[in-house]
């Protein structure tokens, strides 16, 4: 089974992430940031991952450290669960619509962290959630999962829909990329022989 549990403790946050890449979309989420929990639910359900997140942090200051550190810890959990990358599809992509909104996410388990994030949010907050923290979540994930990630909101008016389509598309793209390809069996999906 491709599972991992990662704990991250700093002076700002205490995070625990448990992940099963071959799950059924079950989740248990308690990040302390309700909108983040809603977005993590999208990743679990649309990626078909079993995901548990427990976090406490300095949310009395703001949500920045918690959101970023959950992204970091999730990235570490994915990297650990995927192991040597033998047999994975490597690349994943997804387009997800929600009413007027359309987002595209493309991921490559290249071993080279890189983020292209193009989401022109139409407002600064969704409820109490600062939408600027979305990029911090994905930057933390990318740097610790070792992936190249392109996120584009192609159109949208409602900032909640913009966030939600991004996270849904991310879950689906991630699911595609980590899927085991029986034809590739025990090979690394690279002409270099390593990722």
Curated annotation (Swiss-Prot):
GO terms for biological process: L-histidine biosynthetic process. Pfam families: IGPD. InterPro entries: IGPD_sf, ImidazoleglycerolP_deHydtase, ImidazoleglycerP_deHydtase_CS, Ribosomal_Su5_D2-typ_SF. Gene3D superfamilies: Imidazole glycerol phosphate dehydratase, domain 1. It is an enzyme of class 4 (lyase). Its EC number is 4.2.1.19. The keyword Lyase applies. GO terms for molecular function: imidazoleglycerol-phosphate dehydratase activity. It catalyses: D-erythro-1-(imidazol-4-yl)glycerol 3-phosphate = 3-(imidazol-4-yl)-2-oxopropyl phosphate + H2O. NCBIfam families: PRK00951.1-1, PRK00951.1-5, PRK00951.2-1, PRK00951.2-4. This is Imidazoleglycerol-phosphate dehydratase. It comes from Cupriavidus necator (strain ATCC 17699 / DSM 428 / KCTC 22496 / NCIMB 10442 / H16 / Stanier 337).
């Amino acid at each position: 089974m491709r599972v991992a549990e990662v704990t991250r403790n700093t002076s700002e946050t205490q995070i625990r992430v448990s992940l099963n890449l071959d799950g059924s979309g079950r989740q248990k989420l308690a990040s302390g940031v309700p909108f983040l929990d809603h977005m993590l639910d999208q990743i679990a359900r649309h990626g078909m991952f079993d995901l548990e997140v427990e976090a406490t942090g300095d949310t009395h200051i703001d949500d920045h450290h918690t959101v970023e550190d959950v992204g970091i810890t999730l990235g570490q959990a994915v990297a650990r669960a995927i192991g040597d990358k033998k047999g994975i599809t490597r690349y994943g992509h997804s387009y997800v619509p929600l009413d007027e909104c359309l987002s595209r996410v493309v991921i490559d388990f290249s071993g080279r962290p890189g983020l292209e994030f193009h989401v022109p949010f139409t407002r600064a907050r969704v409820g109490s959630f600062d939408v600027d923290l979305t990029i911090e979540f994905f930057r933390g994930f990318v740097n610790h999962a070792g992936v190249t990630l392109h996120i584009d909101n192609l159109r949208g008016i409602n900032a909640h829909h913009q966030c939600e389509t991004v996270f849904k598309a991310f879950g689906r793209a991630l699911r595609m990329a980590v899927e085991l390809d029986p034809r590739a069996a025990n090979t690394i999906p690279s002409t270099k022989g390593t990722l």
